[in-house]
Amino acid sequence: MDQCGTVERELEKVLHKFGGYGQLCERSLEELIDYAGGLRREILQAAEQDGELSGTLSLVLTQCCKRIKDTVQKLASDHKDIHSSVSRVGKAIDKNFDADISSVGIDGCWQTDSQRILSEVMVEHFFRQGMLDVAEELCQEASLSIDASQKEPFVELNRILEALKVRVLRPALEWAVSNREMLMAQNSSLEFKLHRLYFISLLMGGTVNQQEALQYAKNFQPFAENHQKDIQVLMGSLVYLRQGIENSPYVHLLDANQWADICDIFTRDACSLLGLSVESPLSVSFSAGCVALPALINIKAVIEQRQCSGVWNQKDELPIEVDLGKKCWYHSIFACPILRQQTTENNPPMKLVCGHIISRDALNKMFNGSKLKCPYCPMEQSPGDAKQIFF
């Protein structure tokens, strides 16, 4: 993080200089335009009177040309100074970051199967971003066969999201209504929030939309049990239509951030409904790699320095634990209290009849004949009664 801070400080200096340079350019050019415009008017007036320029005007014209030339040279000199600041950012990056990260790579990630998986993940990412042409081009270049059924959900989601970004609610409302039962099954408030936003947009029209707003309020009826207080607030705002919601105690209803929130809520609930992760797997992998890379580079350097390369030869395990933060926690971690090992897909946690939990490997090792005695209580039971659990 110290390295990032160093580069960020250099970058802030450059941005500050860019801002100052832009203001200087604008001010200098405006002054030159005003000066040259005034001189042009004087020349035109002199031409109308006697048709010839006086010695004084000729001198002023010469001074004007010199002033323009000096200003251009000054701006060019300042621009060169900015270039040196930009180059310092590049030097700071080279100094604080390792340009060669190939040392922490694994040869297996470039095998045919791995490349195919990576291409599929990239295609899905482009589908999620609405970049359908790029995704289809990548499919052709990577010789991937993507079924149309995989693409269609992303096309619809992107169409609805683009509409929400320009504050058009109708496509999202139609989608939410058609999927109401499934959304309610997962306790989603998406449809209510969409109706709420549409109602607020009617309120912004003032008394002209009062009757329409009252009629539209009937859409809140299915959500009265879970959103009673919110509905009361919305109905109370009708009292202030004449003076304007922006001048009332309900001004918070006009908060622009709720449009960004509804995009996030729609993305989350729609992806959940389709069995997709909210974030693109490519984005998650990239973010995790950015967090882990500095630690991996450091441990690799230590391993090479101490000549103990055999430490890093496990296919599915790193030599150190890398904390990716809670954002990257996708499942609970259970450590078997008997073997003192974390459970895996091949060695999952098993719940005994008595309620105690151990790993499958521990269960197999403790199995004796047809009975199994729990290591924590006196209950004896059959190993076949143990059930795999999911946290």
From Swiss-Prot:
InterPro entries: CRA_dom, CTLH/CRA, CTLH_C, Fyv10_fam, LisH, RMD5A_dRING, ZF_RING_GID, Znf-RING_euk. Residues 114-146 form the LisH domain. CDD domains: dRING_RMD5A (cd16794). The keyword Metal-binding applies. It comes from the Eukaryota. It is found in: Nucleus, Nucleoplasm; Cytoplasm. A zinc finger (RING-Gid-type) spans 336-377. Residues 153-210 form the CTLH domain. Disruption phenotype: Morpholino knockdown of the protein disrupts normal development of the mesencephalon, the prosencephalon and the eyes. One of its GO terms (biological process) is proteasome-mediated ubiquitin-dependent protein catabolic process. Its EC number is 2.3.2.27. GO terms for molecular function: ubiquitin protein ligase activity; ubiquitin-protein transferase activity; zinc ion binding. Transmembrane segments: none annotated. It catalyses: S-ubiquitinyl-[E2 ubiquitin-conjugating enzyme]-L-cysteine + [acceptor protein]-L-lysine = [E2 ubiquitin-conjugating enzyme]-L-cysteine + N(6)-ubiquitinyl-[acceptor protein]-L-lysine. Keywords: Cytoplasm, Metal-binding, Nucleus, Transferase, Ubl conjugation pathway, Zinc, Zinc-finger. Pfam families: CTLH, zf-RING_UBOX. GO terms for cellular component: cytoplasm; cytosol; GID complex; nucleoplasm; nucleus; ubiquitin ligase complex. Identified in the CTLH complex that contains at least RANBP9, MKLN1, MAEA, RMND5A, GID8 and ARMC8. E3 ubiquitin-protein ligase component of the CTLH complex. This is E3 ubiquitin-protein ligase RMND5A. It comes from Xenopus laevis.
